[in-house]
Amino acid sequence: MSNNNYERLITKKDVYRVANERLYYLFSLAFQTGDERYIDLMERIGRRMDITLPQDIKRMYCKKCKKPYKNVRVRLKKNVITVTCLECGDIRRFQINR
């Protein structure tokens, strides 16, 4: 007779919750240190777990040089925010609704 009452089953929801916590932790480390390896780890965890990165994290680092947006130029024109990374020169545009 097994002790099924005492065994805890790990559900998919638990796995996604832990992965999401890890994403936020790695992003905080990346933002503190400015190191792109934490961003790379975040993306790998997201791909492995088939999780899309949260929008607030996605918009806080450069997709080209993988550095957190610390050294950027932000411009607002009509309904578009233009973010220019001053490390690599990459330009990202985000539409906003007013």
Swiss-Prot record:
Cofactor(s) the protein requires to work: Zn(2+)
Cofactor annotation remark: Binds 1 zinc ion per subunit.
Keyword Nuclease belongs to the record: yes
Enzyme Commission number: 3.1.26.5
Residues noted as binding Zn(2+) in the record, renumbered to the chain: C62, C65, C85, C88
EC category name: hydrolase
Pfam families: Rpr2
Primary residence: cytoplasm
Single GO MF descriptor: ribonuclease P activity
Keywords annotated in UniProt: Cytoplasm, Endonuclease, Hydrolase, Metal-binding, Nuclease, tRNA processing, Zinc
Cellular localization per UniProt: Cytoplasm
Hydrolase keyword on record: yes
Entry's Gene Ontology BP terms: tRNA 5'-leader removal
Catalysis: reaction(s): Endonucleolytic cleavage of RNA, removing 5'-extranucleotides from tRNA precursor
Subunit field text: Consists of a catalytic RNA component and at least 4-5 protein subunits.
HAMAP family linked: RNase_P_4 (MF_00757)
Family according to the record: Belongs to the eukaryotic/archaeal RNase P protein component 4 family.
Function: Part of ribonuclease P, a protein complex that generates mature tRNA molecules by cleaving their 5'-ends.
Name under which the protein is recorded: Ribonuclease P protein component 4
Organism field: Thermoplasma volcanium (strain ATCC 51530 / DSM 4299 / JCM 9571 / NBRC 15438 / GSS1)
Gene name, Swiss-Prot/TrEMBL: rnp4
